[in-house]
């Protein structure tokens, strides 16, 4: 037994030594290698031949040109990592995303409008599934949807215009009216048409007002409809914010902040914070690289990586949506309290988001500049609390215990 033990111990030692030698050999590579820089299409921009004996000195090539609406952000390997390369390597350019879904005949469909429509139809589908469960008719919901949604979009537009008045109203009545309606040129030039400014608060409040009159006309329980609207809005917003992502708008400040005209973090550090500290998907981080003054110097004072507040808002709205689905299954929740929850949830969320955004809609009162969304959100929270108290006191027995088998 002792001999066998000694033999086994000897074999273990041999394998350990061989393993260590193997590891040492793998760390050293004296073979020549080539580092190749390519452009967006894979064409070679520059080749660097390295002898493998010493650290290869690499001079960064000229930055590749933009491709359509995509612009260059960085190389696939950061310059600080080039000295660690010891084998044939292809370094590719990383670009921002195109904000167009498709272009046909010179006219483009943008992700902004695409995600808004996706959100609207998802909200409609969820609402239709809910109507039968709480004693409403599908046709009533669909009829209301067909005329309330366009008016709500108009409300979102007008809300935005009111706080950006000088951007739209100048040069006479009709040019101003056309700009408000979406013709940015101020003429009936359909190539310039597009609703590039919408505010969700305007859409929400106009939708509630329209729903009030619609339910009065159809003699429907308004609080049941309000709950459907609230659930629909929060999921529609979760989708809609991705349109802001592709437009590189409604973002937060530069990652790491800045002192005066100097960013606190390098571009690589900004990228690493979003990618490896917050663990955001790389395609999101790449598209948060925004050039100085893309919308205005006040909004983007630096070229660098900005906080994706759209993503934070979208994810937190999805959480709120999930909670609302659970609340609908709780029999003691009264009809209308989902609207209360939405007002409080989104009001609090929007105050948090507005504290980071660089492009808020503002107004002045008594010489004090205020953020429109922050003031509105505070009022939403107060309204949500007041509505919940009113429902509990005045609508006893009108709760989800009367609903049929819950969905989700």
What does each model-found stretch correspond to?
Residues 1-3:
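N-terminal secretory signal peptides that target proteins for export/translocation
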Residues 7-15:
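Sec-dependent N-terminal signal peptides
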Residues 24, 49-51, 55-57:
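Sequence contexts marking disulfide-bonded cysteines in secreted/extracellular proteins
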Residues 37, 72-75, 93:
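Extracellular/surface recognition and adhesion modules
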